Amino acid sequence: MKVAVLGAAGGIGQALALLLKTQLPAGSHLSLYDIAPVTPGVAVDLSHIPTAVEIKGFAGEDPTPALVGADVVLISAGVARKPGMDRSDLFNINAGIVRNLIEKVAATCPTALVGIITNPVNTTVAIAAEVMKKAGVYDKNRLFGITTLDVIRSETFIAELKSLNVADVKVNVIGGHSGVTILPLLSQVEGVTFTDEEVASLTTRIQNAGTEVVEAKAGGGSATLSMGQAACRFGLSLVRGLQGEANIVECAYVDGGSEHAEFFAQPVLLGKNGIEKVLPYGEVSAFEANARDSMLDTLKGDIKLGVDFVK
């Protein structure tokens, strides 16, 4: 099993690489790429950790050597948010970065499972899909926008609010991966009830949690460590699915035939072909149905931006 991380010298990439080095199955290969010259050194640093995961780093303009034979590609390359920016402000820089990297993925490892972390995810996933369509290698079951950070934040904040063991909290987060498009389905959380006020404040906190971190870091970065953990969880789930493990379910932003939008985050069953099945997200409350319906124009606009960028 070979996993490639593109953008591996950045804050998310280094955290993700560390977690993968310690958690990938024995015998796996971990390939790190970044434009930054430090990247081979990051791999050397991580290579001193005593796990049976072989690691190699690549720097420079061309990610191709890092991508050869990759089963899973996780893309975190791009610029991070600063105070006062929202995820869409990143579009102008990150759109081109994702397009260029996906062109190389399409040419080098077209059947790999690809997880996009680079923001704005609502748009960058659409860009990736269009690039792969142009290259004639698009498989909607192999492309994912990683929204796991919204899920782990929801789990954490619910457990804190209700004094629960966080390991017991399961929640679906649907929609997209920015602001109002992030919709945690709190009505489905088992064994707990929320007041209307709690639902409203918790939903808003989950939607704005990225900004909470950006502001707390006072210009020194965005959510890199928690995103690294979220991306590792999702990446390991992709690997487990590829290895034939049963019942691996994660929420992800996918081209899953949703009635709501061309791309939509919802639970998916993972397997040897990536998405084995897009799962229904279940019954929702009136609050959630309203929030879902009112986000769709924003989400569709984000998607159109990505499609138009490639065309």
From Swiss-Prot:
It catalyses: (S)-malate + NAD(+) = oxaloacetate + NADH + H(+). It comes from the Bacteria. Transmembrane segments: none annotated. One of its GO terms (cellular component) is cytoplasm. Its EC number is 1.1.1.37. PROSITE patterns: MDH. GO terms for molecular function: L-malate dehydrogenase (NAD+) activity. Pfam families: Ldh_1_C (PF02866), Ldh_1_N (PF00056). The active site is at 177 (proton acceptor). Substrate binds at residues 81, 87, 119, 153. One of its GO terms (biological process) is malate metabolic process. PANTHER family: MALATE AND LACTATE DEHYDROGENASE (PTHR11540), MALATE DEHYDROGENASE, MITOCHONDRIAL (PTHR11540:SF16). Homodimer. Catalyzes the reversible oxidation of malate to oxaloacetate. This is Malate dehydrogenase.
